[in-house]
């Protein structure tokens, strides 16, 4: 794998995020415009990367000569040790890519980036100071696995559709179930205990909404706890889980409860790939 070119402002930079379940690819032109983000389901990292790259170039009418640099990131980047289609190729640090992409898409300088993929990672950003501060094993993989066991499907779109007809009060124990009055700082609609109200004959729809709320609330609570003493009130959500329609209702409630702000940018699921490309423009990448 060659080092990145020394003239970083000519030609299109391609950013590729090779994840566990999906591979995402974007191009950024010399004006800094994101060009038609695209993703495919990952099979194995090499096949997914080359398949995504070839299809992206074809769909956008981009020639190999138009590409100045390819930047790869994500867990699958470890398998890439050669130039892609003979183009200069380098690796971007994933957590830096998370931060750069979220900053670009949100316009914020100070935030915690919540990368909601198979698991969840937390990255603190304060200007150019981008640092991984932790994470949780709860994420999209958790939702898929539990749905596989409890709903006999791991199709997240199907689970989200089922959840639209679900009643969360039949699954979660709420403050209003245990107290006649709101508690200090906790309205009666706040969750007291996840799944504590579930019955043996719970419907598929109620189970679906319960699973989604459990994952999203756990991620949200972890994020808020990670921000304590930092003064940060802005959290930028990126990754595939941000596509769940239930995100907005869960995080709107948490915003009111904790006086914080959850942001879901336009290209939320592509932020890491965008950040990988931007890391080349910023010269903040690893080449090996």
Protein language model regions, located:
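Conserved phosphate-binding catalytic cores of ATP/NTP-utilizing and phosphoryl-transfer enzymes
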Residues: 1-8, 80-114, 119-129, 274-282
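Short glycine-rich, Thr/Ser-proximal phosphate-binding strand/loop in the N-terminal lobe
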Residues: 4, 8-51, 130
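Short glycine-aspartate micro-motif
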Residues: 13-17, 67-71, 111-115, 135
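Short beta-strand-loop/turn "lid" adjacent to the catalytic site in phosphate-handling enzymes
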Residues: 38-42, 53, 58-94, 127-132
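Glycine-rich phosphate-binding loops at beta-strand->alpha-helix junctions
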Residues: 72-78, 225-254, 269
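Glycine-rich phosphate-binding/hydrolytic loop that grips phosphoryl groups
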Residues: 100-105, 143-147, 260-288
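Glycine-rich phosphate-binding loop plus the immediately following alpha-helix
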Residues: 128-183
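Adenine-nucleotide phosphate-binding core of ATP-dependent small-molecule kinases
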Residues: 184-234
């Amino acid at each position: 794998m060659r080092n990145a070119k020394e003239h970083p402002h000519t030609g299109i930079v391609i950013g590729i995020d090779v994840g566990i379940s999906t591979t995402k690819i974007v191009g950024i032109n010399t004006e800094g415009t994101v060009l038609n983000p695209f993703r495919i389901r990952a099979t194995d990292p090499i096949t997914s990367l080359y398949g995504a790259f070839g299809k992206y170039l074809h769909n956008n009418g981009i020639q190999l000569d138009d590409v100045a640099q390819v930047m790869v990131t994500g867990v699958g980047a470890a398998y890439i040790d050669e130039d892609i289609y003979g183009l200069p190729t380098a690796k971007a640090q994933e957590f830096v890519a998370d931060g750069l992409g979220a900053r670009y898409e949100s316009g914020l300088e100070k935030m915690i980036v919540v990368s909601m993929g198979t698991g969840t990672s937390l990255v603190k950003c304060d200007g150019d100071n981008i640092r991984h501060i932790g994470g949780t094993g709860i994420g999209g993989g958790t939702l898929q696995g539990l749905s596989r066991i409890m709903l006999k499907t791991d199709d997240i779109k199907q689970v989200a559709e089922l959840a639209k007809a679900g009643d969360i009060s039949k699954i979660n124990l709420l403050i209003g179930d245990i107290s006649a009055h709101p508690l200090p700082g906790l309205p009666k609609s706040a969750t007291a205990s996840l799944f504590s109200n579930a019955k043996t004959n719970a419907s598929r729809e109620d189970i679906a909404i319960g699973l989604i709320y459990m994952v999203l609330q756990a991620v949200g609570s972890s994020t808020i706890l990670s921000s304590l003493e930092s003064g940060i009130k802005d959290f930028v959500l990126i990754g595939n889980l941000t596509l769940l329609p239930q995100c907005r209702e869960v995080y709107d409630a948490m915003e009111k409860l904790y006086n914080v702000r959850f942001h879901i940018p336009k290209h939320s699921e592509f932020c890491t790939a965008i950040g990988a490309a931007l890391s080349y423009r910023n010269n903040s990448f690893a080449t090996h």
